[in-house]
Amino acid sequence: WLCHPMTYAEFQRFLLWEVAASLPTPDEWAYLCGGGCRTLFPWGDGLDHKMKLHHFESEEDQGKPYDMEQANFFGLSIAYDPYKRELVDGKTLTTCGGDGGCNVCGGMGPLLGYLPCSPHCKPEVREDNEIHNDYDFFRPVIRVQTSGWRMVIDRAQE
């Protein structure tokens, strides 16, 4: 949806008025990302060295799907690439799920390279408020009212 430069405030207005949706809060995003698990990653507290990870694949793994792109317990494919940041709700531009590849490019290795993809990684609050079209993505949330509703029984149909 984003194909031209846009500030975070402009994007939030667009999302609310054009799509009738909002961004998840950082806590909601972490819950969705973790699939309800309490471990560092949805599959456990570490990385299995047999996993096929984007940016760390070997020659023989070319063309095979990446393990982290598989859907989690909620059926979501989320936080599978440390280069991709997901926008979350905040007063200023706030992201979860990646660091733009800083740890990977910095040579930190797979575990620290993928640590920003953990649901327990602290959200990054950025000062520039400019959405980067190559690295920033969003997951719209349509909120459903869950309180204040009451059931009305139509006695004429009984």
Predicted feature locations:
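Disulfide-stabilized, aromatic/cysteine-rich ligand-recognition loop
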Residues: 1-16, 21-24, 95-158
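Functional-site microenvironments in short loops/helix caps that host divalent-cation chemistry
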Residues: 1-107
